[in-house]
Amino acid sequence: MEFIGEEMVNDAFNYWLEKNGFEARVFGLENAFAWNPYSDLIYYSVVMSEQADIMFYEYVDELGLKYEIDNFWLAFLHELGHSETWCFVEEEDYDIPKNITNYDYYRLPREAVATEWAVRFINEHADLVRDLTRIVGPVIDKFFELNEIER
């Protein structure tokens, strides 16, 4: 399915990334948030699992998140965290065991490092996170409106 306005969302994300000196870029919409280590591209999703969101947010709270933040932004910053920390993670840490629970998945070394980076970034750079939501937020809202997607 093709969505109206996907390119404007990508452009808004990439503007913020470039403005703040990040090398990663946003490529587009997928079924889930993801980061590709070979291309350093981030994919975002408009479909979020409510149960997974709750469990992820509980995990993030354990890490000492100081600010309340929507899971969409948290998921994006987690993927950016993969880009920023990939050199600290061993290749075998990218292996995912079969039938893993969300609880255990969040604690895999590569996932934990990316989430810890995101939490630290949010806690230490609240101004940049506000800037992210100010720049990309209205574009995401317009994207949802154009595609008649409920939030």
Sequence positions of predicted segments:
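Long, well-structured alpha-helical subdomains associated
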Residues: 102-109, 116-151
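Post-HEXXH active-site segment of zinc metalloproteases
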Residues: 70, 86-116
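Active-site scaffold of zinc-dependent metalloenzymes
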Residues: 25-70, 80, 86-87
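Alpha-helix capping at helix-to-loop junctions
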Residues: 82, 86-90, 120-127
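Juxtamembrane/interface and other helix-to-disorder boundary residues
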Residues: 3-4, 49-52, 61, 143-150
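Short intrinsically disordered terminal tails
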Residues: 1, 88-90, 149-151
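A structural signal for well-ordered alpha-helical segments within the folded catalytic domains
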Residues: 7, 70-74, 78, 112-116, ...
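Zn2+-dependent metallopeptidase catalytic core
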Residues: 4-21
